[in-house]
Amino acid sequence: MQNTKQKPSTKQKLTIAAIFGAMGPGLLAALSGNDAGGIATYSSAGASYGYKMLWMLPVMTVLLIVTQETAARCGCVTGKGLASLIRERFGVRKSVLAMAALLIANTAVTISEFAGIASGLALFGVPASISVPLVALLVWMLTMSGSFQRIEKILLLVSCVFVTYIVAAFMAGPNWGEVAVDLVVPNIQNDPSYVSLVVATIGTTIAPWMIFLAQNNVVDKNAGEDDIVLQRIDTVSGSIAADVIAGFIIITTGTVLFPAGIQISDAADAARALEPIAGQWSTVLFASGLVAASFLAACVLPGVTSSAICEAFGWERGADRSWDEAPVYRGIITAIIGISAVLVLMPGVDLFQIMMTSQVINGVLLPVVLVFQVVIAADRHIMGANRNGRVWNVLTWATIGVITVLTVVMFVLQAMGYSV
């Protein structure tokens, strides 16, 4: 089952140009991963608990590296996507379970992206009744035509405005001693909202769709076993970049909003955190980045989801396939976009809560995907000499166990009537 393509040796490839070339996709993926739900979750963490949730980020960075590196390595060794490997290793019935989890999680996240678009454009005075249908149509057209790649880098560039959180954090004047302590000393609270936010943070940092996307990207690049080292550089750099930005979002909101007692209930509240650097332009800066990041993810998620499902069950897929050739592939994309847009347009819907809830759903369903991934990655017959080592297996199973326990605690608290 291993990918036997002949490649030049890895040693020949480890030049400065090759290393920087390998880092590019990971860094871009990191920025696109900080989407509407991610910004909402990290902003809420800082606004609600100050720096007290920073300790999670070093842990999440390690776990993100583990899951993304595993995905990339599986792609290099087998030349196949995760969905195909799940079907081959576990059969069709268990593939249905994996794909159902992915479909639910990704649809929830896509809904949050449209909520982010609606929230961002509302700051410019555009009502959701106008913005959501128009953007949904544009997303559908770009996804169906495959022309999304033409504007992908532009959107990534615009979404880079969230890097300004790094500058804003320094300008806000945080207590760096307190930041350093909270970064390394775990702060566990029995507050139900805290537990929910922990699950959401895990779900937005290690999203199920990112695992499928990482492996598919490696397969699409025709990377082989000799590319594993370069792909490892890619994953490590991307994971660190993603969580550095996440950390500064928490520091910024923890410095600006938490002392003032401002709880984030909408995009306008979150935008206030950028006032130290942008002043009266903070709303414009935040809204532009939120819309770009949300639109980017909204274009990626339906395609990733549909491609994985079709791959798992052997159906035709790809933007180059017509409706007659790939009706299921195109139908799933259309359904996800349509359902997401309609739900966001429902009267009285809380857009910010949608963004938060989607990340909780991500966290709850993540163990399902991780179980399949770790079993495949540890299989000698599939991975050969590149199978998971003991440390990687322990970290992955520990992640699965912790998330499962947190999920049970969260649901028990809800059943007991506590507000989560």
Question: For each predicted feature, which ranges?
Answer:
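Juxtamembrane transmembrane-helix boundary signature
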Residues: A29, M56-F90, A98-A108, T253
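Hydrophobic alpha-helical segments and their helix-loop junctions in multi-pass secondary transporters
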Residues: C160-N187, V195-N216, F372-H381, L406-Y418
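Extracellular/periplasmic helix-exit of transmembrane alpha-helices
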Residues: I65-R73, V77, V218-V219, I240-D269
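Extracellular loop-to-transmembrane helix junctions
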Residues: A17, S44-E69, A83, R87, ...
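Transmembrane alpha-helical segments of multi-pass small-molecule transport proteins
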Residues: L97-M99, L123-M144, V161-Y165, P327-V342, ...
